[in-house]
């Protein structure tokens, strides 16, 4: 956090310094940078550069978000870049060095050619806009209530979700329950009070070490409302009643969730941890069948024993994680693993495509324009209120706007040139007429 604050301060300082420099150039004042500013500017550039490189190395898995974000912002970034070029051009060509002028022309050419490479799914006619993707609550509504608790799933119902997404493990006495963290020492410590209730088991890594009675006795909500662990910084927006309800949540069983889903005609999609255990899949299937939920509302995702599940529980809707391995018409992939063109291709082939990890409006907008069937999200309370994507721009209108900007860029220097060379001539001509 400290590094981010330092980076923000240095970035603001560099931007302000650049603005002051532009003002001085515009006023015709000489640029005379104090030695202290030179040192700070050099330090800021080096610090920010190393920071960006470091973040890129640490979060390599997030690099796919860059081209996606450009699809959402490229048309507007290009407009802004053209505006900046228009403002900077008189300063660049006013006695600039040859190399600087050449570099400026090269950058200008790249910016003006950008529209040839901009491919955004939201550059479409309004009447071509696909149906809004359905919402699947990732562990319920984890921004509004503790994840994987009954309160969380009840909150997601208010968002209009069509499915609950959850994670299933088995207790020592073979009761399926809901919990994401798994297979590492202290897997219950993040979301329960295991350290207080069973300190001798606090570092256990296996759900089979706990009976269902022990799991039910754990508090699964108090961690959520504490300032130190508030995962989405959203607790301050909750009512006192919601905070109190969250504080008293417990670990639910799979059967409880299935009964809630059956009551509200909502589907259920889930992962199983750890699916390699003997008979674990069978125990979960038995619980599902015992609940009486409509089998078509069970969106089966785990690849383990899939063929066996198809035999003992026909009627489940099977989702696949890989477009190359899928055998049916249902696909469940992360937002970074399928490009927008592929989504459209699958949808045109009547394949249902669910995209998971979608928590931001801009990403949801892109997927909406691309035709995604549904998204799995933490922020269903935000996405439910969207009546249309953040922006939709008809290609013809974008072309007109682009041509207008180009005209403005090229005509403004011409006007300045005419004023420079013609005004003295006109004034001289008028003076002669008067004499």
Model-based region annotation:
Residues 1-435:
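Phosphate-group recognition and catalysis centered on beta-loop-alpha active-site segments
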């Amino acid at each position: 956090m400290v590094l981010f604050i330092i980076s923000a301060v240095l970035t603001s300082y560099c931007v302000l310094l650049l603005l002051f420099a532009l003002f001085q150039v515009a006023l015709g004042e000489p640029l005379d940078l104090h030695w202290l500013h030179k040192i700070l500017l050099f330090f800021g550039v080096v610090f920010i550069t190393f920071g960006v490189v470091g973040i890129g190395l640490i979060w390599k898995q997030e690099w796919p978000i860059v081209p996606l974000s450009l699809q959402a912002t490229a048309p507007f970034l290009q407009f802004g870049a053209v505006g900046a070029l228009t403002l900077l051009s008189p300063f660049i060509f006013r006695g600039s060095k040859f190399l600087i002028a050449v570099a400026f022309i090269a950058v200008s050419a790249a910016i003006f050619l950008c529209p040839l490479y901009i491919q955004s799914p939201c550059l479409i006619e309004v009447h071509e806009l696909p149906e809004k993707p359905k919402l699947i609550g990732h562990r319920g509504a984890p921004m509004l209530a503790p994840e994987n608790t009954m309160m969380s799933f009840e909150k997601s119902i208010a968002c209009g979700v069509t499915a609950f997404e959850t994670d299933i493990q088995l207790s020592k006495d073979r009761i399926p329950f809901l919990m994401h963290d798994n297979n590492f020492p202290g897997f219950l410590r993040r979301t329960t009070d295991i350290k207080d209730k069973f300190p001798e088991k606090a570092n256990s890594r296996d759900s089979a070490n706990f009976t269902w009675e022990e799991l039910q006795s754990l508090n699964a909500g108090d961690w959520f409302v504490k300032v130190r662990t508030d995962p989405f910084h959203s607790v301050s927006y909750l009512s006192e009643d919601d905070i109190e309800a969250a504080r008293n949540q417990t670990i639910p069983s799979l059967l409880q969730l299935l009964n809630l889903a059956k009551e509200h005609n909502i589907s259920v999609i889930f992962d199983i941890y750890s699916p390699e255990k003997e008979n674990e899949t069978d125990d979960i299937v038995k619980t599902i069948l015992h609940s009486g939920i409509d089998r078509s509302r069970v969106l089966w995702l785990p690849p383990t024993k899939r063929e066996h599940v198809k035999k003992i529980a026909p009627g489940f809707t099977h989702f696949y994680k890989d477009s190359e391995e899928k055998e049916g018409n249902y696909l469940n992939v992360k937002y970074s693993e399928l490009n927008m063109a592929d989504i459209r291709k699958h949808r045109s082939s009547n394949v249902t495509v669910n995209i998971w990890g979608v928590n931001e409006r801009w990403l949801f907008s892109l997927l909406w324009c691309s035709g995604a069937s549904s998204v799995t999200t933490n922020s269903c309370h935000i996405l439910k209120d969207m009546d249309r994507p953040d922006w939709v721009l008809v290609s013809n209108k974008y072309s007109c706007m682009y041509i207008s900007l180009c005209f403005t860029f090229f005509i403004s220097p011409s006007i300045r040139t005419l004023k420079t060379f013609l005004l003295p001539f006109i004034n001289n001509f008028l003076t002669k007429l008067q004499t």
